[in-house]
A protein has these predicted regions:
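N-terminal loops that bind phosphate or other acidic moieties
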Residues: 7-225
Length: 225
């Protein structure tokens, strides 16, 4: 998990936007490390190429990241790369997710937990508008939506930034696991109907990897301050 700090917030906590490319780098590396796993999951009820396509896009994005980039610039770089260079439907989908995060953080010097919540909420809204999917359709939204709820609940309880990020991770993992119980309503897997039940959704799984990696690196930044 992201760290051991689960107490109440006692100081102003934030992540700097300027010259903060480490989070993007960690996400790209995590997708690379899990490429075979993602394709294996996708092969059960999909095309079996999710890991290949994701790895291709994120490796290209990693090559375009610069050490002097801000967090928002690095998110925009990932977005542009995925939209332009990744295959299948996931390029526009994840491109939208990272674009919305970048846009929400662009003008912010300090990425507080409130700023990050807004970025996540904007990302979710963008995905829903683009794909027409909703929670329960067995998509990455089934990871993102519960992750946001868990994060926001921790915020409302007055928890520290690190604790909110831990809650985000837990919500993402629970959402991913819940897709096993769902019947696919969108994409190729939807053709299988009830036969799609019992399997993880590949998009929900890659989204979980992205969110948990992002939270872990952000938490590391906070605790090292």
């Amino acid at each position: 998990m992201c760290g051991t700090d689960t107490g109440e917030e006692t100081v102003m906590e934030y992540i700097r936007n300027e010259k903060n490319v480490k989070i993007a780098e960690a996400i790209c590396e995590a997708i690379h490390e899990n490429a075979a796993y993602l394709s294996e999951i996708d092969g059960a009820i999909g095309d079996g190429d999710h890991g290949v396509n994701m790895n291709k896009g994120f490796l290209m994005a990693r090559e375009r990241l610069r050490a002097d980039m801000s967090f928002s610039e690095s998110m925009k770089t990932i977005s542009r790369t995925l939209v332009m260079d990744i295959g299948g439907s996931m390029g526009p989908i994840y491109g939208t997710m990272f674009s919305r995060i970048a846009r929400a953080c662009k003008q912010e010097e300090k990425l507080t937990k409130e700023v990050f919540l807004k970025a996540l909420q904007d990302a979710l809204q963008g995905l829903q508008e683009l794909a027409g999917a909703k929670e329960g359709d067995k998509t990455l939204i089934d990871t993102l939506a519960p992750a946001i709820r868990a994060y926001e609940q921790a915020m409302q309880e007055g928890r520290s930034y690190a604790a909110c990020l831990c809650a985000l991770q837990e919500g993402a993992e629970a959402g991913r696991e819940h897709t096993k119980e769902l019947v696919a309503k969108i994409g190729r897997a939807a053709r299988l109907g009830e036969r799609s039940r019992g399997y993880l959704d590949a998009g929900a799984t890659s989204c979980c990897i992205i969110l948990t990696t992002m939270a872990h690196q952000m938490c590391t930044d906070i605790l090292e301050k």
